[in-house]
Amino acid sequence: MTDLAAKPGIRTVFIVSDGTGITAETFSHSILAQFEMKFRQVRIPFVDTVDKAHVAVSKINEAFHVEGMKPIVFTTLVDAEANRIVHQARATILDMFQTFIEPLERELGLKSSHAIGRFHQNADTEAYKNRIEAINFSLAHDDGQSHKNLAEADVILVGVSRSGKTPTSLYLAMQYGVKSANYPLIPDDFERGKLPTVLYEYKSKIFGLTIDPQRLSEIRNERRPGSKYAALENCRYEVNEAETLMRRESIKWLSSTHKSIEEIATTILQDIKMERDAY
């Protein structure tokens, strides 16, 4: 099948898991980022039966035959038989459980639970409910939409439009269960030289994001090409005014220009001294 073929010079990577595959995919991103080449990732989740394992092997082998190169396969499969079947694929297999769990079993003198999906909470756990609550809160308080219940916020992000506030807020909620609100800093705020009035009561929760004006202009031009909103001169003005305002108000801030969402979120958690386990 042609849709299984990667472009020349691009290696195909399969993520095979008996759960969502998010854990293996995150790990694979960290590993593959060490190599200066492009990869095409294909996730095969919920491989929790022998039949599904055979289907996964068929897809992997097809990619091998089409491309003439062994695919790279990251696996997190608890079921021994399903794992054995996948290991028969024409591929380079990187078995995360075999790599880490077996040495730990020997060191701890204990057998692991071998429970499928143990890492992620079930829908009826308290942690899962807290995470959903945080996501709903962050969505309701995105881009200054609502002033209600701001006292419940763990953090309030401020910055000019398109500086990374929304994705960071949602990442904090989804990954750490953090209730994050975010507010845009706009020309009216710059003219007054003050934060939005509603935020002063919660100033201790505020963290700022800024961004390089050139990069901001590029991002805004994707949304509103040729507009004053996206013009480089306007972006320079807004960024300068926002940074001046944050300095005046003694608000801690960082530049999102060259940082990933994960790096931004980790910095914020450290700053507000919140210790949260990732879900």
Swiss-Prot record:
A Pfam family hit: Kinase-PPPase
Q: Which UniProt keywords apply?
A: Kinase, Nucleotide-binding, Serine/threonine-protein kinase, Transferase
One GO MF annotation is:
ATP binding
Q: What is its EC number?
A: 2.7.11.33, 2.7.4.28
Among InterPro entries, the record links this protein to:
Kinase-pyrophosphorylase, PSRP
Query: Record-annotated residues binding ADP?
Result: G159, V160, S161, R162, S163, G164, K165, T166
Report if keyword Nucleotide-binding is assigned. Answer: yes
**Reactions catalysed:** [pyruvate, water dikinase] + ADP = [pyruvate, water dikinase]-phosphate + AMP + H(+); [pyruvate, water dikinase]-phosphate + phosphate + H(+) = [pyruvate, water dikinase] + diphosphate
Name the source's superkingdom. Answer: Bacteria
Question: Its biological function?
Answer: Bifunctional serine/threonine kinase and phosphorylase involved in the regulation of the phosphoenolpyruvate synthase (PEPS) by catalyzing its phosphorylation/dephosphorylation.
The entry assigns this protein to a family as follows:
Belongs to the pyruvate, phosphate/water dikinase regulatory protein family. PSRP subfamily.
Q: What is this protein called?
A: Putative phosphoenolpyruvate synthase regulatory protein
Q: Which organism is it from?
A: Ralstonia nicotianae (strain ATCC BAA-1114 / GMI1000)
